[in-house]
Curated annotation (Swiss-Prot):
One of its GO terms (molecular function) is protein-cysteine S-palmitoyltransferase activity. Keywords: Acetylation, Acyltransferase, ANK repeat, Cytoplasmic vesicle, Golgi apparatus, Lipoprotein, Membrane, Palmitate, Repeat, Transferase, Transmembrane, Transmembrane helix. Belongs to the DHHC palmitoyltransferase family. AKR/ZDHHC17 subfamily. It comes from Macaca fascicularis (Crab-eating macaque). The DHHC domain is required for palmitoyltransferase activity. Its EC number is 2.3.1.225. It catalyses: L-cysteinyl-[protein] + hexadecanoyl-CoA = S-hexadecanoyl-L-cysteinyl-[protein] + CoA. The modification N-acetylmethionine is found at M1. Residues 426-476 form the DHHC domain. InterPro entries: Ankyrin_rpt (IPR002110), Ankyrin_rpt-contain_sf (IPR036770), Palmitoyltrfase_DHHC (IPR001594). Palmitoyltransferase that could catalyze the addition of palmitate onto various protein substrates. Palmitoyltransferase for HTT and GAD2. May play a role in Mg(2+) transport. Residues 313-320, 369-370, 492-518 are lumenal. This is Palmitoyltransferase ZDHHC13. The gene is ZDHHC13.
Length: 622
């Protein structure tokens, strides 16, 4: 922020709420309107030869400042408001002037202003990450406190400058450092900043969850409850904050919530307390380990029950309809007791596997006598075995999760910050790692995935660099299995049902096959549903891979970008599209009798542009 008007705001600053942001160099992405208006209202200095050194510093007029200092001005001398030149240079992000003043003897930790702050404090308030880096490199002490008792990390938390928080912690400043009242950054975040951040961001650095402050002896969870900060309460409970610690008044977080009559927080605390109590029972722990198996068994039984009701020996469809409604009502209750919320995302996967189970049983029991000895039978067996294999490989193979140790994360943060690249385009604020090219953070898996394609509902896993090729074969053999069952259904009806399609038409034919075997029609409908989506996805994937060289995420992102562009954006003209044969060779990592050779790229660790020898193209992130 520039200008003298903004500096006066900083001198008399009170710690109110600030909009969060993670812009370039740590500058808040959504700038305060008053500060923006103040910047626009600043007068232009046409003649800088007569301005004083304070104004020259504020406006970054280096030559005028150098002239006055060399004429004898003491760079340590504060102005009438007790603000040094280094303060003015720091708040206005004048890097060259800071270097010059320090070289002329300026005290890097000189206190000044109404809040008795250091230049580092002023730079942090405005979110100037390059200035923070420069001051620390010249010996600024981040542990010093201002007149309100806040150190550097506390100010960064209050003003929600996540890049500065990450940089300070990576430079060995304690995430549990206390202010004058004994409050840690996590306490301040939970109490002063309403919302999920920076509480969630701080939790990634493993702060102490159960430490208490000096005066009230509140934990971070106490402070979040006191402020009614629902998002912070959720984050702290997920991290494992204690529910039993009492403050100086003998109150637990639940007691405080009851006093404040915040019904949502009361519900959250009681639910968490109940879950932690259940964890003590061996049966409950066993059920949690078997949640996915129980979900699969529930799906298998439910699908059998639906088919059994449809095949029930009764002409009353009203009775069958009532039984189906009752069945769905009962099955909707079971997951609430047997399966946790996080594992409900695997419901489509359980539905798919249950469908395949009953498809196989139907083929073996009903269709096998009509197709025994035929090549179609062996083709079906091969297809279903291959489907199960590639489903397992898609599910079990690492899709390309990016991993880094705590020390590597801190080194990456420091490196990115000091090169001016600590922003959301190159740094993942969830994983605290440098993002490889073509990667994306999956919020379901809570990890960055290399060459991210999608999070597949049907496999319950991300599709990325490591398992994308398995996913293609999974779709192919699923289409094959469903195609064979559709074929087998018509063979079964032609052999076992008296149909008059040619004489009476389609409607009569449908009534005849429903009356003949509702179960087979039910299985046919399941097979048709899975055949439809799997074939569509397979064709879409092959088109993207062979003709575009893009992932699903990249294609969707480019289509969204094209809506806001004046010129038409061609999906074929991207650096990743190297031609039909080369795209396939690179994707499946196989050549074609020496005519096409694949280019081996490890997308889990590819951070820079890649030179492709096949077409002499440079690959860039879409």
């Amino acid at each position: 922020m520039e200008g003298p008007g903004l500096g006066s705001q900083c001198r008399n600053h009170s710690h109110g709420p600030h909009p969060p942001g993670f812009g370039r160099y740590g500058i808040c992405a959504h700038e305060n309107k008053e500060l923006a208006n103040a910047r626009e209202a600043l007068p232009l200095i046409e003649d800088s030869s007569n301005c004083d050194i304070v104004k020259a510093t504020q406006y970054g007029i280096f030559e005028r400042c150098k002239e006055l200092v060399e004429a004898g001005y003491d760079v340590r001398q504060p102005d009438k408001e007790n603000v040094s030149l280094l303060h003015w240079a720091a708040i206005n992000n004048r890097l060259d002037l800071v270097k010059f003043y320090i070289s002329k003897g300026a005290v890097v930790d000189q206190l000044g202003g109404d809040l008795n702050s250091t230049p580092l404090h002023w730079a942090i308030r405005q979110g100037h990450l390059p200035m923070v880096i420069l001051l620390l490199q010249h010996g600024a002490d981040p542990t010093l406190t201002d007149g309100e008792g806040f150190s550097s990390i506390h100010l960064a938390v209050l003003f929600q400058h996540m890049p500065i928080i990450a940089y300070l912690i990576s430079k060995r400043q304690s995430v549990n450092m206390t202010d004058v009242n004994g409050q840690t950054p996590l306490m301040l975040s939970a109490h002063k900043v309403i919302g999920p951040e920076p509480t969630g961001f701080l939790l990634k650095f493993n702060p102490s969850l159960n430490v208490v402050d000096k005066i009230h002896q509140n934990t971070p969870l106490h402070w979040a409850v006191a402020a009614g900060n629902v998002n912070a309460v959720d984050k702290l409970l997920e991290a494992g904050s204690s529910l039993d610690i009492q403050n100086v008044k003998g109150e637990t977080p639940l007691d405080m919530a009851l006093q404040n009559k915040n019904q949502l927080i009361i519900h959250m605390l009681k639910t968490e307390a109940k879950m932690r109590t259940n964890q003590k029972f061996r049966l409950w722990r066993w059920l949690q380990k078997c949640e996915l198996f129980l979900l699969l068994m529930l799906s298998v039984i439910t699908m059998w029950a639906v088919g059994y009701i449809l095949d029930f020996n009764s002409d009353s469809w009203l009775l069958k309809g009532c039984l189906l409604v009752t069945l769905f009502f009962l099955t909707s209750l079971f997951p609430r007791f047997l399966v946790g919320y996080k594992n409900l995302i695997y419901l489509p996967t359980a539905f798919l596997l249950s469908s395949i189970f009953w498809i196989f049983m139907t083929w073996f029991i009903l269709f096998f006598p009509d197709l025994a000895g035929a090549p179609f039978y062996f083709s079906f067996i091969f297809s279903i075995v291959a489907f199960l294999y590639f489903f397992y490989k898609t599910w079990a193979t690492d899709p390309g999760f990016t991993k880094a140790s705590e020390e590597e994360k801190k080194v990456n943060i420091i490196t990115l910050a000091e090169t001016g690249c600590l922003d959301f385009r190159t740094f993942c604020t969830s994983c605290l790692i440098r993002k490889p090219l073509r990667s994306l953070h999956c919020h379901v898996c809570n990890s960055c995935v290399a060459r991210y394609d999608q999070h597949c509902l049907w496999t319950g896993r991300c599709i990325g660099f490591g398992n994308h090729h398995y996913y293609i074969f999974f779709l192919f053999f699923l289409s094959m299995v469903c195609g064979w069952i559709i074929y087998g259904s018509f063979i079964y009806w032609s052999n076992h049902c008296a149909t008059t399609f040619k004489e009476d038409g389609l409607w009569t034919y449908l009534n005849q096959i429903v009356a003949c075997s509702p179960w087979v029609l039910y299985i046919l409908m399941l097979a048709t549903f899975h055949f439809s989506w799997s074939t569509f996805l397979l064709l879409n994937q092959l088109f993207q891979i062979a003709f575009l060289g893009l992932t699903s995420h990249e294609r969707i992102s480019l289509l969204k970008q094209s809506k806001h562009m004046k010129q038409t954006l061609s999906l074929r003209k991207t650096p990743y599209n190297l031609g039909f044969m080369q795209n396939l060779a690179d994707f499946f990592q196989c050549g074609c009798f020496g005519l096409v050779k694949p280019c081996v790229v490890d997308w889990t660790s590819q951070y820079t542009m890649v030179f492709h020898p096949a077409r002499e193209k440079v690959l860039r992130s879409v």
